Structures are given as C-alpha cells and as structure tokens.
C-alpha cells in the first residue's frame, strides 16, 4: 500500500521527501503547514553545485505527476525525478505508506537527503496526525532501528562519504527529546543525521511557486467533498444488536445499534470521518456520545456537523436539479447529543479548539448538548430507548462523579445495556470508557455490582425475571409489564394493563421452571432435535394440565412442523402482541451470539451455543443460511401508542427515547434493495437471492484464528458471532447491504522475528488484502463456501432443520408485520408457559456431584425446548452437552449457555452457568434446593467481584498505560477493543497485553476472549509472535486491524461485532 516510490534510485544525487499529514478540517492549519514546509526546505544546506534547489523546485511544479492511491483512499503523491533531484510529496498518507517511504529514503544511496514532516499535530506531544493514526518520535525511532533496514545496509559496501540526512520536524513536545537519540543511530545507519538545523537558504522564486502549488493541493475540501454522498440510494436497517468498531486514528469511533435505536460514540481524529460511509445510509442517528473533548475524538464528528450545516445552506440557496440535491442532502438526522462541554483536553497546534467548534456547530444546528455525570447510589440508568415487544436500552454513567468542576474536565465512562423483549434473547452489555482512569472506572462499576446482569457471562431476561416470578406480590407488575410488551401473560388482565410501567422481560409471571425450560430449550434443541422434541412433549403435557389455551399453543410448538407452519404463514394470523414469546425462539440465536464468536476450536464450539461459536459442516451451514436468506428481513414496525408512551409512563428512569413519526429507530426508514457485493471468503448465504441484508446475517465481527487454517485466512476467513442466518431477507424493505470481511492478525514480512507462530493472516500487505476484499466483486473466484467449509459458525440458537420457519418467526419477532399496539393475539399464538406449581423447585446442579449435575442439566434442557419451539426445535446439536462442556475454550462461560441460568436468575451473582466446572460455583454460592431463585437477595456480591461484559473498549489517551492485571480481573469481557493509535498507547501496549494474559489465566470461568485492535503496531506483532502459543490454551483470539465492511458498491475499514 505504499505510495509512489519517492527515492531509492542511485542515479539521483539528492532526495527530497515532504510529508504532509492528514487533511485539514479547518483553514487555519494551512498557514501553519506552509510555514513548516518553508522552514524545512530552507534548512537544507545542499551544495548548489550538486543541486540547484531553486531550479529543481520550478521543474517539479511544471513536470511532476500526481497519483491517487487506489488502496489508501484520499492519499495523494506528487512525484518528480530529475537528473539532480528526486522529489516526493506525500499528502494525507496512512501510517504504513509513511513507513514505507521512510525506509526507501533511508536505503537511498543519494548523498544528500531531506525529510520534512509537517501537518496537523497535537500541541502537547507534537504527534503528527495522519490519515490513520499518528506519527511520533517513538514511531520514527522504530523505523530508524528497523532490523530489515540494518540488515540491508550491512550487506552493501559502505560509501566513501556517509550520506547526510536532514530532518525537519516539530520543535515542541516529544520531538525535543529526539536529539539525544540521534547520535547513537548514525553508525548503524551509516548516515549523518541533522535534526531541525537553522535556515540556510534564502527565499527564492522557485520555493514560492512550489509552496503556492502545494497550498492549492492542500486547500481544505468542502464538506461535500470530505464526506461524499453514496453512489446508490437506500437506507440501512440494523435489526439486531451490533457494534461497528472503526479505526479512530489517535482516538476511537464506534457505532452501537439495536433494533430501533442507534448510538454514535466519538468521531475519531480524522476529519474524513471513518464512520461516514455507514451513517450516510441511515435516516437518523438517535444519540451521539462524546466521551471526552479533544483532537482525538471530535474532528470526525465536527466534519459531520459541518456537512449538515452545508446541506442547510444548499437547501436555502436552491438551484441544481432535484435529483442531484436529493443525492447530496443525505446526512442523517441527529437526536440527543451527550457532551460534557469544556475546553478540549487536547488540541492541534495552531488549530481550532475542537470542543469550542463542536459547541458552535451544535448551536447552529439547534442542538443543545446534555452533560453526563454519575448519579447517587443506587445507580439508575438513563433509558435511551424503550419499545414494547422490542426491548429497552439503558445507559449507566460510571464517571465522572456528580456535578462540579471535575465533571467538566473528566472523561465520560458509559455502560450501555440492551434488555431485549424476548425472554431467551441475550442481554448485551457494552462499555465505552473514553479516557477514564481504570481506578475511577472500577470505582464506578462497584456501584453497579448489585445488577444481576453483570454477574454472569451470558444473561437473558428470563434469567433476570426468575426470582420475581416466584413472588406472588410481583404478579401484578409482571402481568402489566408483559402486557406492555405485547406478551400474553399467564393470567392476563387487560384492565390492569399499564403501558407506562417499566418494561420487565416477558416471562415475569412465569415460575422458575419456565426459566429453566426456556434457557435450556434453545441450545438443546439445536443440538439434537429429535431427542429434544420427544422430551419436550411431556413437558408440554404438564403445562397443558395447568391451562387449556396454553396447551394448544404449546402443542403447536412442541412439534417442529407445527412450529414452522405458524411462523411461515404468520401473515395470515392476527397481529402477534406477545412478541417476546416468539422472539425468544426466533431471535434467541441472535441474542446469544455475541461477543464470543471469536475463534474457538470446533469441538469446543459445539458446547458454546450461548456464544454461537460452534462451527458446523459446510453443507449444514448452507442448509441453514440459504433457506433463511429467503425469508428474513424484519419489516419496519408501525408506531404503537404503547411503545411511544411506555418510556415515559411508570418509569423512574429518565427516558430519552425519541418519538419518531411512524417508527422508532431506523425501522421507519424506507429501504431500497440493491445488489450485494460478495467478498471472498463469505459464507454461502451471500449468494442467496435475498442476502442483501448480509450485514445482519453475516456479521463478521470476529474471525476464527486457527494456525492450521492459514490458507483460508488468506482469503479473509471470517467467523460471524452469530450463526450466519439471513433471517430477514424475505422483506424487500429493511435491507442491510453490508458484507463484513474481518482480517486475522498478521505479521509484516519485513519483521523477520515472526516465523511459524506468526499471526494467522500471513499476508504482507494487510491493506492490500483489505482492498481486495473491499472490491469483492470477484467473489466468485473464491467460493463463498470457503468460510462455511472451513470455519462456519452456528449460533447456539440457529435452527437448522426448521431454518425457514425460524426465520419467519424471527421476522414476526422483529416486526410482526403489524403495529405493536394491535390487540392481543389469538390464544393459539404460542403464549409463555404457565408457572410451575409452587411445590416444584429446581435442583441446583452446582450443589450436586459433577456427574449428577450434568445429567440434571441435560434433562432440564431437553424438556425446555417446548417453551421455545420456534427457534430451537430443530437445532441438531443438543445431546452432547456434558461432553462439549469438558472441552476448553468455550466450555466455561460459553458452555454456560446464554440462557443457562434456568432457574437461577443472573441476579444470583453466585450462580455460574453450568460449565465444565459445573460443580464449582463461580461467584457466589446458592442454596441446594434452588430456593435462591425465589429469594432475590439471597446471594451477596463480594466486594470486588468481577463484572461480565460483552464488549469493552480499553481506556485510551493518558489512561491507556494505567490498564493493569487488576483491570482485566475485574472487567471480564468477551471482546476487548484497543483503540487510539497515539504514542502513549504504543509505548504501553506490551504491558497491557501481558496484563491480559496474566489475568486471563486466573479467571475462574473458561471464557473465549477476542482482542480487537483498531490499528497496527510493532508492539502487537512482537507480543503476538512471542505469546501465540499460549493464546489457544487461554482462549484468546487476536484479530487483525484491517477488517473491511463492504456495503453495496463501497467498502470501508471497520470490524462489526454482532451480539
């Protein structure tokens, strides 16, 4: 991905390399950059007899060639090679392009060389901002000490006179500390290094012409040029919980979405917003969260705000064709903005204060930012979104403390928690710490330890509702909440419905027994449909004894065929108001898949349905994907009165859920179906007629990184977190045109230290590979089944035999094709099971000997299928539960099925989901008879007990180096994201990675952990090479930083994680 080679020809006696960093978001930086370029050129004391610099600069202006990189979008190279001078000007380069050109310059035999580093740089450290990441003295020394360069120089005869390399760089920040290190490098490099010498040459006509030309090339682009409109129309619909992780340069940028609500977190340091190619396909971004103000987090967001203002001006001015204007005016509407307005913590030298700029732009747009701070104990979340039958999105603020001066200066640390309506779907927990110091972050988490959903690796609403159902006093509340979600409660009483009551997961009124049934059914059914079906029937008979209507419903669910019928022909049935009931079966797979989909051996994957990591034979995966693809796009739901008023009524939390005409979230946007571009290594599902919504069905968040699969990884082997199902492909409306092609971690060939254990992705040019995948029109050359055949993954809830039916019912779950406020459904519509008689209680397997515990688990699991026939009834991998659990990696927590806590709600902080160590409680101890499930407060949470998350960013900025072993002991996530390619992060990278390894080996849960870096680093490569052998034993997968997402006819760097 190197740009046009700028030097390296022995014929040229002199070489000039000018590097200008990232594009400018503001005109004020242009003057500063031109001054730096002039200072650098005039400081070059090249002998006029050898090179007439004034004349050569004039020749450059008239004869140079301009090249736009086809691999690094936005990078330009101005190059000219004459008899006396070879000149290369790199504009807006990536870090890899800069490294390549620096190597070329160092190896160039020219006797006189000049390197000028100019561009936007941080005031505090002097770090130069590039298109991707930054360039600091630390990075520069890494290049000078590169082993490859030294080896090449050692094999060439030494020159009579050592070449002279003049370096002009910022004179402040950490660059001032570079001078002492320079003398020690001269001998090994056979160079005379001169750092920031004073001006030697006078101003000249040639220099003026050169600077004028460069100024024209550096003219800040208009908002429409910086953030280009898409080439094709259509809105993107994200129906399942997911998180897009973008390369944020010096900072971070992420996009979290659930069905009906989207959140943009920070904007990254690049004015050419890394998230733009995704959000331009959305009609609305419901919330924007800025964790901290600064040059590392706001430039990308400010570019979006500038474009929105430019669109307003365009509309006011009129002119142009309607079609053209419509194509350009496509930025999404913005909802609430969370931003602790204050002076930027970091800013660019001679640049604008990004925080002040953001406030100004928001004011012009009529948006008032809302500050965030931690409230009093007990912590109460801010309800961002809540909709009956869909779910609730809460935001907990862990930092900063309540109002005060400290609040305005500190970074925000926010925990987003998605509570789905379906009792069997997975509760999703995602942490965005910003620059919060780990100590403050952990202090904030201590205040949340009473929350049951943080005590288990995988939690579902039914786990949380179990205890409450045993209490008769809560029957009214549970009935109300169930009604509000459109569920048919065990004892429905319309007159007592209170739509405003805070949503409680659908099976609140059911007995603990239901929890067990539902928790077990999905995974067991999936493993062995036949046994599970046969066992479920007796279970259903018991339910029938309690209620005739329920008997009918459950009978329909008990058999795979009956279950399939209602789902496929749901359109003929009355509107399904008890959405949560069918959702579990339909969406259970998508809820549980989360984070763990990173790689674990096939044998272990079978036992980790909760994390949906289990690979299956290619043929089997195809059977699942193709049928599902034909009927799986959720239909936009029409607004329902209940959904609109529920957040406000009866809820003690502050509700910020926007009320949009016709629908909440992207659901309301009309979507245009367009062809999908298939990238190599995507599962067979991509080839299906309706696989345009690949982003949902093929989320390639994680990649299985198994050393033996090197060939496959070359092709972009990817492993989706959830089973590759195209549940919603049936509808032509909600189209998610996104193909994800994650890249495995790889080593650069230039680094000889990475031999055999080198990262799975063995390609040298990661960006080149990414570009190949991005342009994936040649997918046919690489059979889509390559991924399926090598490492296909099935979510624990992916129904194989009844795939089509499952897809349909899932569609019902998502949209039901009817307004959520429709009347209660026909009693035959799969209502939640009745509570078990009070005399029945579950035996806690953890209190039994391992063998007995496994038997109990198997039995209860196999019965449970009836409760959720729609999604699991046909799953083939059910029986070998005990055996699967004993297989490492996913066995521990993954094996603790997402729906694992059958009778023990996650509130039992003490109940570890049955894992291969099922006989040993992981966090707290419960009573043997399961009575704890009827006593919510029985288990006390230890003072510093760990919290479990699905995805967590590691603190960045000044707090990056403070992340230690204790942090990983207390914050246990299935996915960790390392972002912020700044100097501090690079210097402290090894210590953080070692802390993860040291901490992971002491976890009492055998969890599969995926590490997702947003940038490439030498420290990461070195660590990977030295510790790779331990990764599989510890259950750690490291992804590459060059994952690509292909959407319609475009691609952009990002890693998508689906939960």
UniProtKB/Swiss-Prot annotation:
InterPro entries (UniProt xref): MAP1, MAP1B/S_N
Keyword check for Cytoplasm: yes
UniProt feature, compositional bias: Pro residues: 825-836
Phosphoserine: modified positions: 321, 472, 582, 640, 655, 657, 731, 759, 809
A biological process term (GO) from this entry: regulation of microtubule depolymerization
Keyword match Chaperone: no
Notes concerning its domains: The N-terminus of the heavy chain associates with the C-terminus of the light chain to form the heterodimer complex. Its C-terminal part of the heavy chain interacts with ESR1.
Subunit field text: Heterodimer of a heavy and a light chain. Interacts with microtubules and actin. Both MAP1S heavy and light chains interact with microtubules. MAP1S light chain interacts with actin. Interacts (via C-terminus) with GAN (via Kelch domains). Interacts with ESR1, LRPPRC, RASSF1 isoform A and isoform C, microtubules and VCY2. Interacts with WDR47 (via N-terminus of light chain).
Protein name per its UniProtKB record: Microtubule-associated protein 1S
Lineage, opening ranks: Eukaryota, Metazoa, Chordata, Craniata, Vertebrata
